[in-house]
Protein backbone atom coordinates (compact mmCIF):
# COMPACT_ATOMS: atom_id res chain seq x y z
CA UNK A 1 0.00 0.00 0.00
CA UNK A 2 1.42 3.41 -0.94
CA UNK A 3 1.73 6.22 1.61
CA UNK A 4 -1.55 8.13 1.74
CA UNK A 5 -1.56 11.91 1.91
CA UNK A 6 -5.03 12.64 3.32
CA UNK A 7 -6.79 9.45 4.46
CA UNK A 8 -5.97 8.26 7.98
CA UNK A 9 -7.18 5.16 9.81
CA UNK A 10 -10.70 6.57 9.92
CA UNK A 11 -11.13 8.74 6.85
CA UNK A 12 -9.99 12.36 6.68
CA UNK A 13 -10.08 14.42 9.85
CA UNK A 14 -8.84 17.77 11.13
CA UNK A 15 -9.69 21.18 12.55
CA UNK A 16 -12.41 23.05 10.67
CA UNK A 17 -10.91 25.87 8.62
CA UNK A 18 -7.49 24.23 8.38
CA UNK A 19 -6.59 22.01 5.43
CA UNK A 20 -8.00 19.47 4.76
CA UNK A 21 -11.28 20.49 6.47
CA UNK A 22 -11.99 23.56 4.34
CA UNK A 23 -14.82 24.19 1.86
CA UNK A 24 -12.36 24.27 -1.05
CA UNK A 25 -10.72 20.98 -0.15
CA UNK A 26 -13.98 19.18 0.59
CA UNK A 27 -15.52 20.36 -2.70
CA UNK A 28 -12.48 18.97 -4.55
CA UNK A 29 -12.72 15.77 -2.47
CA UNK A 30 -16.37 15.38 -3.46
CA UNK A 31 -15.44 15.82 -7.11
CA UNK A 32 -12.49 13.37 -6.89
CA UNK A 33 -14.60 10.78 -5.06
CA UNK A 34 -17.34 11.27 -7.64
CA UNK A 35 -14.93 10.68 -10.53
CA UNK A 36 -13.67 7.44 -8.96
CA UNK A 37 -17.03 6.13 -7.77
CA UNK A 38 -18.84 6.95 -11.03
CA UNK A 39 -16.70 4.31 -12.73
CA UNK A 40 -18.62 1.64 -10.84
CA UNK A 41 -22.09 2.31 -12.28
CA UNK A 42 -24.56 3.76 -9.74
CA UNK A 43 -24.70 7.54 -9.52
CA UNK A 44 -26.30 7.95 -6.08
CA UNK A 45 -24.37 8.85 -2.92
CA UNK A 46 -25.85 8.94 0.62
CA UNK A 47 -24.54 11.78 2.81
CA UNK A 48 -25.06 11.86 6.57
CA UNK A 49 -23.53 13.98 9.33
CA UNK A 50 -23.43 14.40 13.08
CA UNK A 51 -24.59 17.56 14.87
CA UNK A 52 -21.50 19.79 14.46
CA UNK A 53 -22.24 23.28 13.18
CA UNK A 54 -19.65 22.84 10.41
CA UNK A 55 -21.64 19.93 8.96
CA UNK A 56 -23.89 22.32 7.01
CA UNK A 57 -20.93 23.95 5.27
CA UNK A 58 -19.17 20.67 4.51
CA UNK A 59 -22.21 18.83 3.16
CA UNK A 60 -22.86 21.72 0.75
CA UNK A 61 -19.25 21.58 -0.45
CA UNK A 62 -19.37 17.80 -0.87
CA UNK A 63 -22.63 17.99 -2.79
CA UNK A 64 -21.24 20.63 -5.16
CA UNK A 65 -18.17 18.51 -5.89
CA UNK A 66 -20.19 15.35 -6.44
CA UNK A 67 -22.64 17.18 -8.73
CA UNK A 68 -19.74 18.51 -10.81
CA UNK A 69 -18.60 14.90 -11.30
CA UNK A 70 -22.13 13.87 -12.32
CA UNK A 71 -23.23 12.15 -9.09
CA UNK A 72 -26.42 12.86 -7.12
CA UNK A 73 -26.45 13.24 -3.33
CA UNK A 74 -29.21 12.08 -0.98
CA UNK A 75 -29.00 13.74 2.45
CA UNK A 76 -30.07 12.04 5.69
CA UNK A 77 -29.56 15.00 8.02
CA UNK A 78 -28.01 14.23 11.44
CA UNK A 79 -27.63 10.45 11.50
CA UNK A 80 -25.34 7.97 13.29
CA UNK A 81 -22.39 6.69 11.25
CA UNK A 82 -23.68 3.08 11.30
CA UNK A 83 -27.06 4.35 10.06
CA UNK A 84 -25.38 5.79 6.97
CA UNK A 85 -23.67 2.42 6.38
CA UNK A 86 -27.08 0.71 6.70
CA UNK A 87 -28.86 3.18 4.40
CA UNK A 88 -26.07 2.91 1.81
CA UNK A 89 -26.76 -0.83 1.63
CA UNK A 90 -30.55 -0.60 1.57
CA UNK A 91 -30.64 2.15 -1.07
CA UNK A 92 -28.02 0.31 -3.18
CA UNK A 93 -26.10 3.59 -3.33
CA UNK A 94 -22.64 3.66 -4.85
CA UNK A 95 -21.23 4.92 -1.54
CA UNK A 96 -22.11 6.55 1.75
CA UNK A 97 -20.30 9.57 3.15
CA UNK A 98 -20.33 10.59 6.82
CA UNK A 99 -19.35 14.10 7.92
CA UNK A 100 -18.15 13.60 11.48
CA UNK A 101 -15.11 13.66 13.75
CA UNK A 102 -16.66 11.01 16.00
CA UNK A 103 -15.64 11.61 19.63
CA UNK A 104 -13.56 14.76 18.92
CA UNK A 105 -14.62 18.31 19.99
CA UNK A 106 -17.02 20.35 17.82
CA UNK A 107 -14.26 22.41 16.17
CA UNK A 108 -12.92 19.27 14.48
CA UNK A 109 -14.67 17.49 11.65
CA UNK A 110 -13.97 14.75 9.17
CA UNK A 111 -15.14 12.82 6.14
CA UNK A 112 -15.36 9.06 5.91
CA UNK A 113 -16.69 6.82 3.17
CA UNK A 114 -18.61 3.56 3.06
CA UNK A 115 -18.72 1.27 0.04
CA UNK A 116 -21.92 -0.07 -1.54
CA UNK A 117 -21.99 -2.98 0.94
CA UNK A 118 -21.77 -0.70 4.00
CA UNK A 119 -18.11 -1.46 4.76
CA UNK A 120 -15.24 1.05 4.89
CA UNK A 121 -13.84 1.89 1.44
CA UNK A 122 -10.96 -0.39 0.40
CA UNK A 123 -7.49 1.18 0.55
CA UNK A 124 -7.09 1.08 -3.24
CA UNK A 125 -10.25 3.17 -3.73
CA UNK A 126 -9.05 5.74 -1.16
CA UNK A 127 -5.71 5.86 -3.00
CA UNK A 128 -7.51 6.35 -6.33
CA UNK A 129 -9.44 9.30 -4.82
CA UNK A 130 -6.18 10.85 -3.59
CA UNK A 131 -4.67 10.45 -7.07
CA UNK A 132 -7.71 12.17 -8.61
CA UNK A 133 -7.28 15.08 -6.14
CA UNK A 134 -4.01 15.96 -7.88
CA UNK A 135 -5.81 16.61 -11.18
CA UNK A 136 -7.53 19.89 -12.15
CA UNK A 137 -11.27 19.95 -11.41
CA UNK A 138 -13.42 19.66 -14.52
CA UNK A 139 -17.20 19.78 -14.71
CA UNK A 140 -19.38 17.30 -16.61
CA UNK A 141 -21.79 18.57 -19.27
CA UNK A 142 -24.77 20.48 -17.85
CA UNK A 143 -27.15 17.70 -18.84
CA UNK A 144 -25.11 15.22 -16.75
CA UNK A 145 -24.79 17.25 -13.51
CA UNK A 146 -25.84 15.55 -10.29
CA UNK A 147 -28.89 16.54 -8.22
CA UNK A 148 -29.57 16.76 -4.49
CA UNK A 149 -32.46 15.25 -2.52
CA UNK A 150 -33.36 14.48 1.08
CA UNK A 151 -34.26 11.05 2.49
CA UNK A 152 -37.42 11.91 4.42
CA UNK A 153 -37.77 8.73 6.50
CA UNK A 154 -34.07 8.02 7.19
CA UNK A 155 -34.45 8.08 11.00
CA UNK A 156 -37.54 5.85 10.96
CA UNK A 157 -35.85 3.29 8.72
CA UNK A 158 -32.84 3.06 11.02
CA UNK A 159 -34.95 2.89 14.20
CA UNK A 160 -36.78 -0.13 12.75
CA UNK A 161 -33.48 -1.74 11.78
CA UNK A 162 -32.11 -1.33 15.33
CA UNK A 163 -35.30 -2.75 16.88
CA UNK A 164 -35.01 -5.72 14.53
CA UNK A 165 -31.71 -6.74 16.17
CA UNK A 166 -33.51 -7.24 19.52
CA UNK A 167 -35.31 -10.61 19.91
CA UNK A 168 -39.00 -10.24 19.02
CA UNK A 169 -40.08 -12.48 21.91
CA UNK A 170 -38.40 -10.19 24.49
CA UNK A 171 -39.24 -6.72 25.78
CA UNK A 172 -37.50 -4.00 27.79
CA UNK A 173 -40.66 -3.45 29.84
CA UNK A 174 -39.81 -2.90 33.50
CA UNK A 175 -36.31 -1.57 32.79
CA UNK A 176 -35.46 2.03 33.62
CA UNK A 177 -32.66 3.17 31.32
CA UNK A 178 -30.70 6.43 31.25
CA UNK A 179 -29.30 7.15 27.80
CA UNK A 180 -26.65 9.81 27.05
CA UNK A 181 -26.54 10.75 23.36
CA UNK A 182 -23.52 13.11 23.66
CA UNK A 183 -25.58 15.90 22.00
CA UNK A 184 -24.68 13.99 18.85
CA UNK A 185 -26.16 11.99 16.02
CA UNK A 186 -28.12 9.48 18.15
CA UNK A 187 -30.13 12.18 19.97
CA UNK A 188 -33.33 11.52 17.98
CA UNK A 189 -32.74 7.79 17.48
CA UNK A 190 -31.58 5.95 20.63
CA UNK A 191 -34.32 7.17 23.03
CA UNK A 192 -37.00 6.19 20.49
CA UNK A 193 -35.52 2.71 19.95
CA UNK A 194 -35.47 1.99 23.69
CA UNK A 195 -38.94 3.44 24.34
CA UNK A 196 -40.49 1.51 21.46
CA UNK A 197 -39.01 -1.70 22.91
CA UNK A 198 -40.80 -0.98 26.20
CA UNK A 199 -38.20 0.68 28.43
CA UNK A 200 -38.74 3.69 30.66
CA UNK A 201 -36.16 6.12 29.26
CA UNK A 202 -34.46 9.15 30.79
CA UNK A 203 -32.57 10.88 27.96
CA UNK A 204 -29.65 13.28 28.46
CA UNK A 205 -27.29 14.80 25.91
CA UNK A 206 -30.22 15.24 23.52
CA UNK A 207 -30.07 19.02 22.99
CA UNK A 208 -27.43 19.58 20.30
CA UNK A 209 -26.62 23.20 19.47
CA UNK A 210 -23.83 22.53 16.99
CA UNK A 211 -21.11 23.18 19.55
CA UNK A 212 -21.86 20.95 22.54
CA UNK A 213 -21.25 17.57 20.90
CA UNK A 214 -19.14 15.30 23.18
CA UNK A 215 -18.77 18.15 25.69
CA UNK A 216 -18.50 16.55 29.16
CA UNK A 217 -20.94 13.87 28.04
CA UNK A 218 -21.30 10.72 25.98
CA UNK A 219 -19.04 7.68 25.71
CA UNK A 220 -15.83 9.65 26.32
CA UNK A 221 -17.04 11.16 29.62
CA UNK A 222 -19.61 9.05 31.48
CA UNK A 223 -19.54 10.98 34.79
CA UNK A 224 -22.84 12.72 34.11
CA UNK A 225 -24.41 9.39 33.14
CA UNK A 226 -23.08 7.70 36.29
CA UNK A 227 -24.60 10.43 38.47
CA UNK A 228 -27.94 10.26 36.69
CA UNK A 229 -28.17 6.45 36.88
CA UNK A 230 -27.69 6.62 40.65
CA UNK A 231 -30.04 9.60 41.04
CA UNK A 232 -32.83 7.95 39.02
CA UNK A 233 -32.19 4.50 40.57
CA UNK A 234 -32.04 3.21 36.99
CA UNK A 235 -31.20 -0.37 36.07
CA UNK A 236 -28.63 0.62 33.47
CA UNK A 237 -27.15 3.53 31.53
CA UNK A 238 -25.93 3.73 27.93
CA UNK A 239 -23.61 6.42 26.53
CA UNK A 240 -22.90 6.92 22.84
CA UNK A 241 -20.25 9.10 21.24
CA UNK A 242 -20.98 11.96 18.84
CA UNK A 243 -21.49 9.80 15.76
CA UNK A 244 -23.01 6.76 17.46
CA UNK A 245 -20.45 4.12 16.56
CA UNK A 246 -19.29 3.68 20.17
CA UNK A 247 -21.12 2.70 23.34
CA UNK A 248 -20.17 2.66 27.01
CA UNK A 249 -22.49 1.43 29.74
CA UNK A 250 -23.05 2.07 33.44
CA UNK A 251 -24.46 -0.50 35.87
CA UNK A 252 -27.03 0.23 38.61
CA UNK A 253 -24.20 0.89 41.10
CA UNK A 254 -22.69 3.58 38.87
CA UNK A 255 -19.74 1.50 37.63
CA UNK A 256 -18.53 2.09 34.09
CA UNK A 257 -18.73 -0.91 31.73
CA UNK A 258 -16.34 -0.54 28.79
CA UNK A 259 -15.95 -2.15 25.38
CA UNK A 260 -13.95 -5.09 26.74
CA UNK A 261 -16.70 -5.96 29.23
CA UNK A 262 -19.40 -5.47 26.58
CA UNK A 263 -17.53 -7.85 24.26
CA UNK A 264 -17.26 -10.41 27.09
CA UNK A 265 -21.02 -10.26 27.79
CA UNK A 266 -21.97 -10.56 24.11
CA UNK A 267 -19.48 -13.41 23.50
CA UNK A 268 -20.67 -15.34 26.56
CA UNK A 269 -24.32 -14.87 25.59
CA UNK A 270 -23.54 -16.03 22.05
CA UNK A 271 -21.89 -19.15 23.50
CA UNK A 272 -24.90 -19.83 25.76
CA UNK A 273 -27.30 -19.51 22.83
CA UNK A 274 -25.15 -21.66 20.56
CA UNK A 275 -24.74 -18.74 18.15
CA UNK A 276 -21.04 -17.94 18.60
CA UNK A 277 -19.06 -18.66 15.46
CA UNK A 278 -15.37 -18.99 16.27
CA UNK A 279 -14.01 -16.56 18.83
CA UNK A 280 -13.80 -12.86 19.66
CA UNK A 281 -11.43 -10.18 18.39
CA UNK A 282 -10.05 -7.41 20.60
CA UNK A 283 -7.10 -5.08 20.07
CA UNK A 284 -3.64 -4.51 21.48
CA UNK A 285 -5.36 -2.20 24.01
CA UNK A 286 -7.85 -4.84 25.20
CA UNK A 287 -7.49 -5.65 28.89
CA UNK A 288 -5.74 -8.91 29.79
CA UNK A 289 -8.74 -9.63 32.02
CA UNK A 290 -10.88 -10.05 28.88
CA UNK A 291 -8.47 -12.56 27.40
CA UNK A 292 -8.35 -14.58 30.66
CA UNK A 293 -12.16 -14.55 31.12
CA UNK A 294 -12.79 -15.71 27.54
CA UNK A 295 -10.14 -18.42 27.96
CA UNK A 296 -12.02 -19.76 31.00
CA UNK A 297 -15.12 -20.08 28.80
CA UNK A 298 -13.14 -21.80 26.06
CA UNK A 299 -13.69 -18.89 23.66
CA UNK A 300 -10.70 -18.18 21.36
CA UNK A 301 -9.41 -14.59 21.46
CA UNK A 302 -7.28 -12.69 18.93
CA UNK A 303 -5.83 -9.18 19.05
CA UNK A 304 -5.89 -6.77 16.13
CA UNK A 305 -4.11 -3.45 15.74
CA UNK A 306 -5.96 -0.52 17.32
CA UNK A 307 -8.72 0.86 15.10
CA UNK A 308 -12.11 -0.56 14.19
CA UNK A 309 -11.03 -1.12 10.58
CA UNK A 310 -8.32 -3.50 11.85
CA UNK A 311 -10.79 -5.33 14.11
CA UNK A 312 -12.98 -5.83 11.04
CA UNK A 313 -10.02 -7.05 8.96
CA UNK A 314 -9.09 -9.58 11.66
CA UNK A 315 -12.69 -10.82 11.88
CA UNK A 316 -12.80 -11.32 8.13
CA UNK A 317 -9.41 -13.05 8.14
CA UNK A 318 -10.49 -15.52 10.87
CA UNK A 319 -14.12 -15.92 9.77
CA UNK A 320 -15.35 -14.81 13.21
CA UNK A 321 -18.37 -12.56 13.88
CA UNK A 322 -17.77 -10.41 16.99
CA UNK A 323 -15.05 -7.94 17.91
CA UNK A 324 -14.57 -4.75 19.89
CA UNK A 325 -12.20 -2.07 21.09
CA UNK A 326 -12.18 -1.16 24.77
CA UNK A 327 -13.15 2.38 23.70
CA UNK A 328 -16.61 1.02 22.83
CA UNK A 329 -16.46 0.24 19.11
CA UNK A 330 -18.30 -3.08 18.91
CA UNK A 331 -18.63 -4.91 15.57
CA UNK A 332 -21.25 -7.65 15.24
CA UNK A 333 -21.05 -8.98 11.70
CA UNK A 334 -24.23 -11.05 12.02
CA UNK A 335 -26.11 -7.75 12.41
CA UNK A 336 -24.02 -4.87 11.03
CA UNK A 337 -21.06 -4.08 8.79
CA UNK A 338 -19.44 -1.54 11.10
CA UNK A 339 -19.31 -0.47 14.76
CA UNK A 340 -22.82 0.36 15.96
CA UNK A 341 -23.34 1.67 19.50
CA UNK A 342 -27.12 1.24 19.60
CA UNK A 343 -27.08 -2.32 18.23
CA UNK A 344 -24.26 -3.34 20.60
CA UNK A 345 -26.14 -1.86 23.56
CA UNK A 346 -29.26 -3.79 22.57
CA UNK A 347 -27.32 -7.08 22.62
CA UNK A 348 -26.24 -6.43 26.22
CA UNK A 349 -29.82 -5.50 27.13
CA UNK A 350 -30.90 -8.80 25.53
CA UNK A 351 -28.55 -10.66 27.90
CA UNK A 352 -29.92 -8.70 30.89
CA UNK A 353 -33.54 -9.54 30.03
CA UNK A 354 -32.99 -13.13 28.90
CA UNK A 355 -30.97 -14.11 31.99
CA UNK A 356 -32.85 -11.88 34.48
CA UNK A 357 -29.44 -10.61 35.61
CA UNK A 358 -28.19 -7.11 36.30
CA UNK A 359 -25.43 -5.60 34.18
CA UNK A 360 -23.23 -5.70 37.29
CA UNK A 361 -23.73 -9.46 37.65
CA UNK A 362 -23.17 -10.08 33.94
CA UNK A 363 -19.74 -8.43 34.30
CA UNK A 364 -18.79 -10.40 37.41
CA UNK A 365 -17.14 -13.25 35.47
CA UNK A 366 -14.45 -10.89 34.19
CA UNK A 367 -11.89 -9.11 36.36
CA UNK A 368 -10.28 -6.10 34.73
CA UNK A 369 -6.57 -5.72 35.47
CA UNK A 370 -5.44 -2.18 36.32
CA UNK A 371 -4.70 -0.45 33.02
CA UNK A 372 -3.46 3.13 32.85
CA UNK A 373 -3.61 5.11 29.63
CA UNK A 374 -1.78 8.45 29.35
CA UNK A 375 -2.19 10.58 26.23
CA UNK A 376 0.80 12.78 25.42
CA UNK A 377 0.30 15.52 22.83
CA UNK A 378 3.30 16.36 20.69
CA UNK A 379 4.11 19.04 18.14
CA UNK A 380 6.24 18.94 15.03
CA UNK A 381 7.21 16.21 12.62
CA UNK A 382 9.47 14.23 14.96
CA UNK A 383 7.90 11.03 16.29
CA UNK A 384 8.79 10.68 20.02
CA UNK A 385 8.52 6.89 19.69
CA UNK A 386 11.76 6.92 17.70
CA UNK A 387 13.65 8.42 20.67
CA UNK A 388 16.42 6.30 22.19
CA UNK A 389 15.53 7.58 25.68
CA UNK A 390 11.87 6.52 25.30
CA UNK A 391 13.00 3.07 24.14
CA UNK A 392 15.37 2.74 27.12
CA UNK A 393 12.75 3.78 29.73
CA UNK A 394 10.18 1.43 28.15
CA UNK A 395 12.60 -1.50 28.40
CA UNK A 396 13.25 -0.67 32.09
CA UNK A 397 9.49 -0.66 32.77
CA UNK A 398 9.05 -4.02 31.06
CA UNK A 399 11.80 -5.47 33.29
CA UNK A 400 10.01 -4.12 36.39
CA UNK A 401 6.72 -5.72 35.31
CA UNK A 402 8.57 -9.05 35.11
CA UNK A 403 6.15 -10.69 32.67
CA UNK A 404 3.08 -9.88 34.79
CA UNK A 405 1.88 -6.97 32.70
CA UNK A 406 2.10 -5.20 29.35
CA UNK A 407 3.41 -1.95 27.91
CA UNK A 408 2.05 -0.48 24.69
CA UNK A 409 3.08 2.78 23.04
CA UNK A 410 1.39 3.89 19.86
CA UNK A 411 0.85 7.00 17.78
CA UNK A 412 -2.80 7.98 17.29
CA UNK A 413 -4.09 7.65 13.75
CA UNK A 414 -6.40 10.67 14.11
CA UNK A 415 -4.65 13.18 16.43
CA UNK A 416 -1.06 14.30 17.23
CA UNK A 417 -0.98 12.06 20.31
CA UNK A 418 1.21 9.30 21.67
CA UNK A 419 -0.85 6.85 23.73
CA UNK A 420 1.06 5.25 26.60
CA UNK A 421 -0.63 2.18 28.09
CA UNK A 422 0.69 0.15 31.02
CA UNK A 423 -1.19 -2.82 32.46
CA UNK A 424 -0.38 -4.99 35.46
CA UNK A 425 -1.56 -6.42 38.77
CA UNK A 426 -0.83 -3.43 41.03
CA UNK A 427 -2.60 -0.16 40.20
CA UNK A 428 -0.16 2.06 42.10
CA UNK A 429 2.84 0.52 40.32
CA UNK A 430 1.14 0.63 36.91
CA UNK A 431 0.25 4.34 37.34
CA UNK A 432 3.81 5.28 38.32
CA UNK A 433 5.31 3.33 35.43
CA UNK A 434 2.90 4.82 32.87
CA UNK A 435 3.76 8.35 33.96
CA UNK A 436 7.49 7.56 33.89
CA UNK A 437 7.20 6.59 30.21
CA UNK A 438 4.87 9.55 29.48
CA UNK A 439 7.44 11.98 30.92
CA UNK A 440 10.10 10.52 28.61
CA UNK A 441 7.73 10.86 25.63
CA UNK A 442 7.02 14.52 26.57
CA UNK A 443 10.74 15.28 26.73
CA UNK A 444 11.33 13.62 23.36
CA UNK A 445 8.38 15.42 21.69
From Swiss-Prot:
Active site (UniProt): 102 (phosphoserine intermediate)
GO biological process terms on file: carbohydrate metabolic process; peptidoglycan biosynthetic process; UDP-N-acetylglucosamine biosynthetic process
Q: Which residues form a coiled coil?
A: none
**Post-translational events:** Activated by phosphorylation.
Question: Any idea which residues bear Phosphoserine here?
Answer: 102
What is written in the cofactor note of this entry? Binds 1 Mg(2+) ion per subunit.
Query: Record keywords: Magnesium included?
Result: yes
Q: Does the UniProt entry include the keyword Metal-binding?
A: yes
Catalysed reactions listed for this entry: alpha-D-glucosamine 1-phosphate = D-glucosamine 6-phosphate
Classification via PROSITE patterns = PGM_PMM
Q: A Gene Ontology CC term for this entry?
A: cytosol
- What cofactor is this protein dependent on? Mg(2+)
Q: What are the GO MF terms of this UniProt record?
A: magnesium ion binding; phosphoglucosamine mutase activity; phosphomannomutase activity
Q: What is its EC number?
A: 5.4.2.10
Which NCBIfam families does the entry link to? glmM, PRK10887.1
Q: Which family does it belong to?
A: Belongs to the phosphohexose mutase family.
Q: What is the protein name for this chain?
A: Phosphoglucosamine mutase
Amino acid sequence: MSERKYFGTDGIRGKVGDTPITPEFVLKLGWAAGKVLARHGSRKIIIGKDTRISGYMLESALEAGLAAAGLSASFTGPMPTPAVAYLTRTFRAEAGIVISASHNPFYDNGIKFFSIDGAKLPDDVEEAIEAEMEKPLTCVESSELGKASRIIDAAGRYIEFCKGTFPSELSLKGLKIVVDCANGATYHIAPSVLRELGATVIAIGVEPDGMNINEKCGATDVRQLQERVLQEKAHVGLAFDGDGDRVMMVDHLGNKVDGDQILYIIAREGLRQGQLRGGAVGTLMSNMGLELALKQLGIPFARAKVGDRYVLEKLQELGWRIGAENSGHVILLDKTTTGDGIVAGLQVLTAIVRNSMSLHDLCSGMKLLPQILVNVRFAGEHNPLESEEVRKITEQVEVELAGRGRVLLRKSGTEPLIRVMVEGEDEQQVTALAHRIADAVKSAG
